Structure formats: C-alpha cells, structure tokens
C-alpha cells in the first residue's frame, strides 16, 4: 500500500502514511509467531519509510492497537465464544477475564475501533505535522514499556 501511495504523495507535495500494527509485535503470544513477526516488521518498515521520505514531506507512523472489541470477538464462534467455552463461563465474563487476568490491561476493558480511528485521524491531520517515525500505542496499558 505504501509503495502505491508514496509516488502520489510525492506528486502532491507530501502526505502522511499511517500503518496499523498490533501490540502482538511487541508481546507475542503462543501460536501467533507469524502474525507477531509481521507486525514487528511493520514497525521497522514504517520507521524506514519515515527516515527516507520525511525530508520530502511524507511522514510515516504506526498505530499499535492492543485487544480491540471487533467482530473477531463478538461473532458467533469468535474469540469471545471460544474463551467462554474453554473456561465454561459466559462470553462477557470470558472477555473480562481476558483483559484482567490472561492479558491484563490497566484499563480492564478492551479498546473500541473508534479509539484507534481517533489516533489515525490525528496522524493524518495537520495537527501532527511534526510527528513522524513514531509508534502510537493504543492498548489500554498492556505493554507498559518505557
């Protein structure tokens, strides 16, 4: 996607690339190695693009969501139902357990898609004109990294 966008941005005088990663790139889980590796590589790609193209007025940043309440959790047979079945509890209790015990979030609640969308809206706006080569973590405090 970036490969296609950069020439158009160069022709129009600049722009903002926003990549959507995952905290799985920094906090890999069992059985998720390919996904984690791809998301970590996306961080390096975005920073490389920022290094090359920021002098040409193209910024590049990554939004790094944590657990987010999407249809992957809510659809029949989704993550919520799978966890509920595994633990023998209802779906909402299973999701609460996920974010308080299994993969603790400081907020004790999953993010919503709008939480990520608001950060992306900022990063593509003129308000972020000096923001490039950055990671914006939106994970309810899951990573707690310094």
Question: What name fits each language-model region?
Answer:
Residues 54, 59, 131-133:
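Short, small/polar-rich loop/turn modules that mediate ligand/substrate recognition or access, typified
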């Amino acid at each position: 996607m970036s490969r296609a966008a950069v020439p158009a941005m160069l022709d129009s005088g600049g722009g903002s690339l926003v990549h959507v990663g995952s905290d799985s790139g920094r906090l890999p889980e069992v059985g998720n190695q390919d996904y984690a590796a791809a998301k970590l590589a996306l961080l390096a790609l975005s920073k490389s693009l920022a290094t090359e193209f920021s002098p040409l007025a193209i910024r590049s940043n990554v939004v790094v969501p944590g657990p987010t309440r999407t249809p992957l959790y809510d659809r029949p047979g989704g993550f919520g139902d799978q966890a509920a079945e595994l633990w023998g509890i209802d779906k909402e209790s299973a999701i609460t357990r996920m974010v308080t015990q299994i993969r603790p979030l400081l907020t004790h609640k999953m993010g919503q898609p709008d939480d990520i969308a608001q950060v992306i809206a900022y990063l593509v706006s003129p308000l972020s004109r000096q923001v490039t080569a950055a990671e914006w973590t939106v994970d309810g405090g899951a990573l707690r990294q310094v």
